[in-house]
Structure formats: structure tokens, C-alpha cells
Amino acid sequence: MLRKQIGEKGIAFIMVLWVMALLTILVTEFAYSMRTEVRAARNFKEEIEAYYLALSGVNMAIAEILLEYDFNYLGEKSGVLFAKRDGTRMPLNREFPIGDGRVSYTIIDEESKININVASRGMIWDLLRVTGIEIENRDVITDSILDWRDINQLSQLNGAEDDYYLKLAYPYEAKDGNFDTLEELLLVNGVTPEIFYGINNVPLDVFREEKKSAFSNEYSGIAEYVTTTGTGLININTASEKVLEARFGFAVANQIIAQRQAGHFQQPSYGGIVKSTSFTVLSRGYAQNGPIYHEIKAIIERNTAKPEIKIKYWNESI
């Protein structure tokens, strides 16, 4: 009888332990779940804050672009800057706190680049040359770009139209119209990720058919030197050496760089411009100065006749 009572007490004790263990697990799981929900709610709140901070940066950039200015020039850190001929310089600070967060934005001059929609054959060919593309590839890519943007199905000597693209493993048609985004160039015959981004700058998520070692030249990439917007004229204050050489030739490019080092051009010269109207804005908002941020990219075109802007491109998912 005594042994039976002891056995029953032992079973009861074990059951109590099991219940306590189960309750402990449930409480721990509940606490963890609550902490996760609180953290998720806080992150969501900070993501919303970061988005609106980034949006405020875009609006600040637009306000700058709408100011009355006479010429643009390159700043050391924050892209293109605006100035008047009387020596007035627009505010240079493009990183500042707002509330508990922080905003940082950059303005990039799209007219410091070659407009791929209006560039001549010679200009495209020379851009490929200064970025390291072999001569045989230059002819193919140049003619294929011209075929992509023209409105007919007649192929250039080294180009490609529908009869080429429709035979690919994943077929598509030539656009026969202007490029809307730079990434469309990756669809053009001959343009590889290495040629587009630069051999050392291809994003990890971009498919590469050839290994890096297969390329003999150190391609610097054409993406940073071309645009799909703007008048097609080059801003001689903000254009890179490669763009200047592709547009004006080596000798004139060196003259422009030398004069630029002595002081910014305040009047148009060499067939270029000094006052741009098309810009890319990259704005980043940080919530509470923490790791959570949001980035917005926009291409803004300013009306030359009155203080109005047109948004040509908008991306909130960078």
C-alpha cells in the first residue's frame, strides 16, 4: 500500500514537472513572439520614417534645381553644384539631420553624359574606344545600338534587327525606338554585363555568360557615361574626361580639362553647354541615425522657359 502511494506521488510529481516545462516553453515562446512583433513594428515604423526622409531629400534637390542659376560645376562630394556669374554659390550642404533621422542626397548631371538616343555613330564608337572595347566589338555594338533605336527593320552593316534577336535562346524583338532606361542596352547585340557595368563592377545578381578571365581588356564600363535624357549637348563643366574625348577628341578634351582646372566655364564654349536641365537625384533617408534607410532615385528635367520640372524616372526600390 505504501509503495503504491509512493508510486502515485512520483507519477503526480513527474506530471507537475511536465506541466511546468510545457508552461515554461509556452511563456518563452510567447515572450519571443511578442519581442519579434515589437521589433517588426519598430522596424516598420523606422522604414516609413526613412522613406519620407528620403522623399524630403528629393524635394530639397528639386528646390535646388528650380533655383535661378547660370552654370553648373562639379563639387568634391555631392555631385553637380549650381552657381551664378556674380560669384553666388548655391548651398553646398546636402547631408543634414531632420528630427531624429538624417537625409543625404546627391545631384548628378545627366548632360555630363552622352545621350544614347541622339548620339552619332562616331560618338558612340569613340565612347566604346575610350572605355576599352576592342575595335571589332565597337563596330558590332555601335551598329546594333543604331538599329535598336531606329524605326525600321534594315540592319546596319554590323548591326542586328528582329531576324537576329528572334533566333536567341530567349527571343525578343528589337525596340525600333528610343531607349527608355540604360539597362535596355543589355538587350543590344554585343553589349555584355562587363561592357555595360565595367569588368570589375558587374552586380552579383547579373547573369554572366563568360568568365571574367575570358576578357582581354579592362573594360571600364559605359553605363556611367551614357544617358537616355537631356538635349544631347555636353556640359563642359561637368563631363568626365572620357565623355569629353568621345565628343570632342583627345586634343580638345585636354584643352577643356586644363581650362576647367583654372576656373569653371561660365559661358558655353567648344559647342558644349554650361547650364544643364536634366539631373539624376539619389536621396537616402536614415531613421533615427540607425542602420535602417530608404533610397530613392529620380531623373528630373527642368523646363528651360519657366520654373517647372518633369519627373522622367522614379525608383523607390533601389
Regions found by a protein language model. Give the residues of each.
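Compositionally biased linear targeting/interaction segments
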Residues: 2-318
